[in-house]
Curated annotation (Swiss-Prot):
Record has Cell membrane as a keyword: yes
Family annotation (PROSITE patterns): ABC_TM2 (PS51012)
Name of the protein described by the UniProt record: Probable doxorubicin resistance ABC transporter permease protein DrrC
Family, per entry: Belongs to the ABC-2 integral membrane protein family.
Membrane topology: Multi-pass membrane protein
Species of provenance: Mycobacterium tuberculosis (strain ATCC 25618 / H37Rv)
Length: 276
């Protein structure tokens, strides 16, 4: 009997502990849903045009109209401000399209159907954050490629270049969290578009187009300390040289603050949208 028991134990299949198995399923299901979102966004020509084509055209126009003016003011190529500005703008615009897509899935009942399936509950929300980060990365690379064609060049080496690319992705996560939170608590796309308008104002009232001292004194504190200005200053420093520590810390503080504020409402809103 002892021999038989030993043989049975040896032949028994090895199983992962419950926590390890759940973690493995969570990762697999998150990647699967991320791929689903990216595939659908890539096939949506409106999203592609709004998130990639229009920013490219806007960059070309800004370079033609303001490139020489920026050179007169800064004594350097205006592309070192225009390319970061458009990369951040594309990240913000794309986040709005992502939020509207979430509202569409909620209205079609897809979120509710996914909620009752044997799928990790957190994978649906995490996959959207991951998919948006990948989308922002792709958009940033496209904007960078366009800037290189126009004459943009990195002057600080490989590591600062990679840090330059990471800035829109990091800030884009916070922007996506904020816009998605708003989208989960409203059924009107006009509200989400209103949030995009506020973000667009933040883009234009930044140090991306004109230096800080060109603004009226009463608005300079807002312009200097808003997240887009911090991000543009960091990207400019990574590309052509200059201070990067202070603007990078400012951008990271803004990102962390937005994510912390939105974390609980985002989780509650996603659960409510998936169960109603």
């Amino acid at each position: 009997m002892i021999t038989t028991t030993s043989q049975e134990i040896e032949l028994a299949p090895t199983r992962l502990p419950g926590s390890q198995n759940a973690a493995r399923l969570f990762v697999a299901q998150t990647l699967l849903q991320t791929n689903r979102l990216l595939t659908r966004w890539a096939r949506d020509y409106i999203t592609v045009i709004g998130a990639i084509v229009l920013p490219i055209l806007f960059m070309v126009v800004l370079n033609i109209v303001l490139g020489n003016l920026a050179y007169v003011v800064t004594h350097d190529s205006g592309l070192y401000s225009i390319v970061p500005l458009i990369a951040l703008g594309a990240a913000i615009t794309g986040s709005t399209f992502v939020a509207i897509d979430l509202m569409r899935e909620r209205s079609f009942g897809l979120l509710a159907r996914l909620w009752v399936l044997p799928v990790h509950r957190a994978s649906g929300l995490i996959s959207r954050i991951l998919a948006n980060a990948i989308r922002t990365l792709v958009t940033t690379l496209v904007m960078l490629g366009t800037g290189v064609v126009l004459g943009f060049r990195f002057r600080q080496g490989l590591i600062p270049s990679l840090m330059w690319i990471s800035v829109p992705v990091i800030l884009g996560i916070a922007i996506a969290a904020m816009v998605t939170t708003v989208a989960l608590y409203t059924a009107q796309t006009v509200v989400v578009e209103g949030v995009e308008l506020v973000q667009a104002i933040a883009i234009f009232f930044s140090t991306g187009l004109v230096p800080l001292n060109s603004y009226p004194g009463w608005i300079q504190p807002f312009v200097a300390h808003q997240p887009v200005s911090y991000a543009i200053a960091a990207m400019r420093g990574f590309a052509m040289g200059g201070p990067v520590l202070s603007p990078m810390i400012g951008m990271l503080v803004w990102t962390a603050g937005i994510c912390v504020v939105c974390a609980v409402p985002l989780a509650i809103g996603y659960r409510r949208a998936s169960t109603h």
